[in-house]
């Protein structure tokens, strides 16, 4: 069985990761951070990047030495065996019914802002977005990367244009003096802003598709992380400068409001299109990553439908299965009018648990200073689970339930059950 096609370069990797991190958050999170922390949020971004760096470095080193479509599940399997590898894979896949429909709703919301769509029109927009993801996905990782590199360029261009038109100068940035930082507001902002950096685990599934994973995967991960952090910080400066936040204003409306203020109502469509593309980019990388994880998990039976690749070395069957689940979840949620706010928090707990499992794998697989970074990253993940509070029990219950209920299977070589 031949593997996935290795076609990604450094620039494409940077585009994939930065758009997966920006995603649905770039239009909303800066306003939310400004709401809870005010000017303190300007310090929160660099602090958050410093805190995330140990986790990112561990992801980068593991991806360099053990590139696989299985991503974190593969790292965990290398460290702790195939059973926990399968549990980790299914834990990641359990986000599909909750997280992806929520992101689809956010993306379709830009259609509502532009055209006044409601109900079935928004549903059609969500299904159309999934169809576009399918088309891009069947063209290969390189096509996704090229598109998402263009999208990150548009996002950066929008922020630069706002800075230029708004005449924002470094002297005007309201940085609080270090002695005046309110720690309560800083911690509150960090708890909101961490979700902007959920995306490293999805990027890990693409490590095996780099032309030179040992060289380019770590570089793409670190540069993409810094680029996304810089864009988020620039957005926060803009939101604070124009006072475009508040309890009575939808967070995602902050940047469109600024665009209208600076460039007129006719420019609203530009902000909405870029906002939609940012959401699409995040959806795309997650769905492509889910497909590669499903394909990887099916490799124990090479003749299985989901284990097959197309003539272009693309896991189309796995992609179709993932998108089928997304369509069903979207239709059910639309029919039942389910409120996803609380469920998204539960899903975030699962992401942190996956990060924690990756750090534990790093503690076993890595040596020297990288093992120390894995320990630091693991402690940070435990702290983040504590910040989620009792809702983190959902992730713990899912982990325990999968471990106890996931059917055991025999390895064909020696008949051992795992």
What do these predicted ranges mean?
Residues 1-31, 35-40, 44, 53, ...:
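Membrane-interface "cap" regions at the ends of multi-pass membrane proteins
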Residues 3-4, 42, 116-128, 146-272:
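Helix-loop-helix junctions that connect adjacent transmembrane segments
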Residues 17, 21-25, 151-165, 224-232, ...:
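Small-residue-rich segments of transmembrane alpha-helices in multi-pass membrane proteins
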Residues 26-30, 104-107, 136-142, 266-267, ...:
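Transmembrane helix-loop junctions in multi-pass membrane proteins
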Residues 74-81, 113, 222-284, 303-342, ...:
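TM-loop-TM module centered on a large, flexible mid-protein loop between adjacent transmembrane helices
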Residues 360-418:
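A generic transmembrane alpha-helix motif of multi-pass inner-membrane proteins
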């Amino acid at each position: 069985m031949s593997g996935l096609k290795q076609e990604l370069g450094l620039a494409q990797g940077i585009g994939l990761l930065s758009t997966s991190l920006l995603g649905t958050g770039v239009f909303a999170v800066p306003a939310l951070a400004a709401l809870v922390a005010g000017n303190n949020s300007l310090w929160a971004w660099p602090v958050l990047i410093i805190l995330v760096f140990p986790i990112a470095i561990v992801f980068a080193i593991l991806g360099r030495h053990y590139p696989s479509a299985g991503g974190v599940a593969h790292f965990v399997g290398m460290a702790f065996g195939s059973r926990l590898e399968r549990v980790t894979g299914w834990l990641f896949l359990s986000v599909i019914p909750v997280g992806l429909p929520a992101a689809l709703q956010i993306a379709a919301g830009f259609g509502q802002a532009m055209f006044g769509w409601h109900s079935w029109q928004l549903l059609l927009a969500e299904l159309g977005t999934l169809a576009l993801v399918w088309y891009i996905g069947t063209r290969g990782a390189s096509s996704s990367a090229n598109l998402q590199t263009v999208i990150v360029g548009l996002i950066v261009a929008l922020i630069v244009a706002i800075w230029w038109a708004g005449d924002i100068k470094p002297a005007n940035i309201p940085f609080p003096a270090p002695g005046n930082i309110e720690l309560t507001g800083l911690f509150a902002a960090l708890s909101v802003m961490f979700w902007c950096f959920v995306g490293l685990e999805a990027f890990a599934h693409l490590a095996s598709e780099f032309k030179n994973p040992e060289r380019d995967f770590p570089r793409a991960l670190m540069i993409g992380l810094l680029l996304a952090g810089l864009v988020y910080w620039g957005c926060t400066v803009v939101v604070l400068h124009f006072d475009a936040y508040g309890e009575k204003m939808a967070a995602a409306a902050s940047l469109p409001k600024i665009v209208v203020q600076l460039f007129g109502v006719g420019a609203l469509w530009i902000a909405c299109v870029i906002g939609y593309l940012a959401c699409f980019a995040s959806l795309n990388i997650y769905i492509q990553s889910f497909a590669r994880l499903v394909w990887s998990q099916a490799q124990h039976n090479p003749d299985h439908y989901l284990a097959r690749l197309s003539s272009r070395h693309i896991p189309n069957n796995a992609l179709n299965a993932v998108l089928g689940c997304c369509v069903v979840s979207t239709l059910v949620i639309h029919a039942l009018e389910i409120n996803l706010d609380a469920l998204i928090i539960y899903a975030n707990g699962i992401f942190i648990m996956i990060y924690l499992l990756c750090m534990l794998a790093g503690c076993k697989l890595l040596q020297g200073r990288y093992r120390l970074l894995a320990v630091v990253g693991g402690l940070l993940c435990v702290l983040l689970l504590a910040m989620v509070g009792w809702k983190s029990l959902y992730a713990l219950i899912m982990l325990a339930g999968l471990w106890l209920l996931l059917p055991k299977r025999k390895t064909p070589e020696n008949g051992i059950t795992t």
